[in-house]
UniProtKB/Swiss-Prot annotation:
<comment type="function">
    <text>Component of the cytosolic iron-sulfur (Fe-S) protein assembly (CIA) machinery required for the maturation of extramitochondrial Fe-S proteins. Part of an electron transfer chain functioning in an early step of cytosolic Fe-S biogenesis, facilitating the de novo assembly of a [4Fe-4S] cluster on the scaffold complex CFD1-NBP35. Electrons are transferred to DRE2 from NADPH via the FAD- and FMN-containing protein TAH18.</text>
</comment>
<feature type="compositionally biased region" description="Acidic residues">
    <location>
        <begin position="161"/>
        <end position="170"/>
    </location>
</feature>
<feature type="binding site">
    <location>
        <position position="307"/>
    </location>
    <ligand>
        <name>[4Fe-4S] cluster</name>
    </ligand>
</feature>
<comment type="similarity">
    <text>Belongs to the anamorsin family.</text>
</comment>
<dbReference type="GO" id="GO:0005758">
    <property type="term" value="C:mitochondrial intermembrane space"/>
</dbReference>
<feature type="binding site">
    <location>
        <position position="232"/>
    </location>
    <ligand>
        <name>[2Fe-2S] cluster</name>
    </ligand>
</feature>
<dbReference type="Pfam" id="PF16803">
    <property type="entry name" value="DRE2_N"/>
</dbReference>
<keyword id="KW-0963">Cytoplasm</keyword>
<dbReference type="GO" id="GO:0046872">
    <property type="term" value="F:metal ion binding"/>
</dbReference>
<protein>
    <recommendedName>
        <fullName>Fe-S cluster assembly protein DRE2</fullName>
    </recommendedName>
</protein>
<dbReference type="GO" id="GO:0016226">
    <property type="term" value="P:iron-sulfur cluster assembly"/>
</dbReference>
<feature type="region of interest" description="Fe-S binding site A">
    <location>
        <begin position="215"/>
        <end position="232"/>
    </location>
</feature>
<keyword id="KW-0001">2Fe-2S</keyword>
<dbReference type="InterPro" id="IPR031838">
    <property type="entry name" value="Dre2_N"/>
</dbReference>
<keyword id="KW-0496">Mitochondrion</keyword>
<dbReference type="Pfam" id="PF05093">
    <property type="entry name" value="CIAPIN1"/>
</dbReference>
<feature type="binding site">
    <location>
        <position position="227"/>
    </location>
    <ligand>
        <name>[2Fe-2S] cluster</name>
    </ligand>
</feature>
Length: 341
């Protein structure tokens, strides 16, 4: 008996377990231990070791219990099936989930740990009848058969193939004509206006217009949220309201940012002036600016000509507001105005 022992890669590290399995298998099959060959299943699956086809009577798969969870590749079952003889047995630690793969390869699954390769050849059984029955049947059959008289000359046959071809051609022409009529675009075809299907001859609607039911609650209140398959337009209204709300928020935020920037610039300018006044920095004007401001310069007069008379006669924007009256041509110092400018 040709026997093969397939080993899991982790079981190879335990030589004692392998030898014990070989002894048990030899005792079970009643064969010599030397008749049992062994290979690692990974090498068989990758093709490094080739098995002889239809050679083994028994193939045993030895693996640790935890290997029962992981399925073997389908290629392994195909190789094992080809290596077994008819009625050969494959058993061992076979994953239960691999039963379908085994059936697809041709195995008969007898149990979770035993598969059998069925025999593809069946015995031929010849069916014979008794000799006496055959004779009686044949004689009776001969008596029942009628006899016909042979005619002296065979009847003449006429060739009707040409008529059949003519009929077939006429039938084909009729079929082609009927098909072409269906696809023919004739100007006589009447085109129906879709509006006429909705209105009568008087122009009135044939039936009431079906308005989609609004997404309203029984008590008359509006729903907080439109239905998933809303058809009354509530979903579009909600989207428009949301877009308007987002636009308003964006506008407010932009205005706030603009005002904040302007306010920050004013604060920075105010702080700069305050710091300059603390450090005693004097505001200096160019000659043209002094000429425009100081109306006491000879040959220059104010717009109203009353700057030297006092605040009662000075304009609202006069730079001499708050100063006492002075004589025309008198030198006026405006250094005190540095903090206000």
């Amino acid at each position: 008996m040709n026997t093969l022992l397939l080993l899991h890669p982790t079981i190879v590290t335990e030589p004692q377990a392998v030898e014990a399995a070989k002894d048990s298998l030899a005792q079970k099959l009643g064969t010599d231990k030397s008749n049992i060959s062994q290979h690692i299943i990974d090498r068989v699956a990758t093709g490094q070791v080739s098995l002889r086809p239809s050679y083994y009577n028994h193939i045993q798969y030895l693996a640790p219990p935890e290997a029962n969870v992981k399925k073997l590749p389908v290629k392994c079952y195909e190789i094992i099936f080809e290596a077994l003889q008819s009625n050969g047995v494959f058993e061992g630690t076979i994953p239960p989930e691999s039963a379908t793969d085994g059936i697809l390869q041709g195995f008969l699954v007898e149990s979770d740990t035993k598969w059998v390769k069925p025999s593809t050849l069946g015995s031929v059984v010849s069916l014979k009848r008794p000799a006496g029955q055959n004779k009686t049947k044949s004689s009776a059959f001969k008596k029942e058969m009628p006899f016909f008289k042979k005619l002296s000359s065979p009847p003449t046959l006429t060739d009707s193939s040409e008529a059949d071809e003519d009929e077939e051609s006429q039938l084909n022409e009729k079929l082609k004509g009927s098909k072409l009529i269906y696809f023919d675009e004739s100007s006589d075809d009447e085109i129906i206006d879709e509006d006429e299907l909705l209105r009568d001859d008087d122009g009135a609607l044939k039936g009431p217009v079906v308005v989609p039911v609004k997404c309203a609650l029984p008590n008359g209140k509006r729903r907080k949220k439109a239905c998933k398959d809303c058809t009354c337009g509530l979903k579009e209204l909600e989207e428009n309201e949301q877009n308007e709300r987002l636009d308003a928020q964006a506008s407010i935020l932009s205005k706030l940012a603009t005002s904040a920037n302007a306010e920050a610039e004013k604060i920075e300018e105010r702080l700069r002036r305050k710091q300059a006044s603390k450090e005693g920095e004097e505001v200096k004007f160019t000659e043209q600016e002094v000429t425009e401001i100081d109306f006491t310069i000879q040959g220059k007069t104010g717009g109203c000509g009353s700057c030297a008379l006092g605040d009662a006669f000075r304009c609202d924007g006069c730079p001499y507001l708050g100063l006492p009256p002075f004589k025309p041509g008198q030198a006026i110092s405006i250094e005190g105005l540095g903090a206000d400018i």
